[in-house]
Amino acid sequence: MASNNPHDNLSDQTPSDDFFEQILGLPNFSASSAAGLSGVDGGLGGGAPPMMLQLGSGEEGSHMGGLGGSGPTGFHNQMFPLGLSLDQGKGPGFLRPEGGHGSGKRFSDDVVDNRCSSMKPVFHGQPMQQPPPSAPHQPTSIRPRVRARRGQATDPHSIAERLRRERIAERIRALQELVPTVNKTDRAAMIDEIVDYVKFLRLQVKVLSMSRLGGAGAVAPLVTDMPLSSSVEDETGEGGRTPQPAWEKWSNDGTERQVAKLMEENVGAAMQLLQSKALCMMPISLAMAIYHSQPPDTSSVVKPENNPPQ
């Protein structure tokens, strides 16, 4: 509780503490309180003089004086009567004296009211902070993430490369179906075999085409890849055997029967066998024409076979 000595230095106190110090320091406050408590009607004494309130900040060194005392003039050191009597029946609050000094009293009452209102914490003056209205939830269009399977990429270049490899694999499988007995383990060897097979087919087509046109003599080097005279054995061997044509030798070693058997079972295998021996299939009439078109060798006479291969 603050001290009742009016001459204490109250410069470090707030205006609200200064106000209470002035009210509690008045000598008439205790007398009017005692008279009010002893009254029958429970009010304050009717003859009690009004309290005097000094409005000042407490910074100039003089706070309390007599009711009619003289002090420094000015707003901060003026004494104003403060009516606290409740016998008027006009409700609670400070009572304004009826006699007045004009605008000076009204100004002092306004100052008192303002200082009293500053003592009370104002809660109703602060507006309630409303939470900002939440924006309506709008579903964002999120691009679905494409999850790649194991061993596959989602990059466009990688996808294009994978599609290219798949097309190459499909073409190679198609070639494997066209060329039988091809090596399927080594891709490089398989491609070499396919190239040789295509060359062999082209040779057969050329031979058949020239036989149709009557160029049987020009077909013989293409069929055997060597002159027909070179395919004949030496005139005399160690056993003194007579030479025989090459086609007779091929017929005697079972090549003809093997090719005929493969033609019934697998045409591709028969073609492969002929290709391995540098042979090709042609009509018998074309073979006979090629054979008879070759001039006889002066060193040896080639005896034609009576029963040519069928």
UniProtKB/Swiss-Prot annotation:
bHLH domain residues: 152-201
Single GO biological process annotation from the record: regulation of gene expression
Keywords for the protein's UniProt record, in alphabetical order: Developmental protein, DNA-binding, Nucleus, Transcription, Transcription regulation
SUPFAM superfamilies, A to Z: HLH, helix-loop-helix DNA-binding domain (SSF47459)
GO annotation, cellular component aspect: nucleus
Disordered: region residues: 124-156, 229-253
GO terms assigned for molecular function: DNA binding; DNA-binding transcription factor activity; protein dimerization activity
Localization: Nucleus
InterPro entries attached to this UniProt entry: bHLH_dom, HLH_DNA-bd_sf, IND-like
Pfam families linked: HLH (PF00010)
Tissue specificity as recorded in UniProt: Expressed constitutively in roots, leaves, stems, and flowers.
Assembly, per entry: Homodimer.
The protein's role, per its UniProt record: Required for ovule fertilization.
Name of the protein in question: Transcription factor UNE12
Organism, scientific name: Arabidopsis thaliana (Mouse-ear cress)
